[in-house]
C-alpha cells in the first residue's frame, strides 16, 4: 500500500504579487523551491492564512533571491499581496518508508528569506504554553 504524506512546505510566506492575467500557477523564489525540495511544475497547495482560502496549483521557478511569491491566474482573486500563505506539497510513500518519513519544513522571514536553523514545527498547544 502507498500513503500520501506531507512532503514539504514553505511556512508563512508573504504574497508579493497577484497576477490575474497569467495562465495559472504560483511563482516561487528559486532559493525557496530548493530549500523546500519543490520542483517546477510540482503540485502545490496554497493555504492562505490571512484570507482562510485553500487551493491547489503548480510551482513555477522565480528569480533566486527575489523573495517572490506570485499567485497567478484565477487564484489571484483569493490571494493578495501582503497575505500570509503556507505552500505545501505531498508525496506517495511506500508503507515500508512511512515510519522513517521526514518532511522538509522551511520557515521564512517577512521578506521570504529562509530562517536558518529553524526546521522543526512546534504543535499549537505546546507553542502556546511555552
Curated annotation (Swiss-Prot):
SUPFAM superfamilies: ADC-like. Substrate binds at residues 57, 73-75. Gene3D superfamilies: 2.40.40.20. It is found in: Cytoplasm. The modification Pyruvic acid (Ser) is found at residue 25. The keyword Lyase applies. Binds 1 pyruvoyl group covalently per subunit. CDD domains: Asp_decarbox. Pfam families: Asp_decarbox. Its cofactor is pyruvate. The keyword Lyase applies. The active site is at 25 (schiff-base intermediate with substrate), 58 (proton donor). Pathway: Cofactor biosynthesis; (R)-pantothenate biosynthesis; beta-alanine from L-aspartate: step 1/1. Heterooctamer of four alpha and four beta subunits. HAMAP family: PanD (MF_00446). This is Aspartate 1-decarboxylase. It comes from Myxococcus xanthus (strain DK1622). The lineage of its organism: Bacteria, Pseudomonadati, Myxococcota, Myxococcia, Myxococcales.
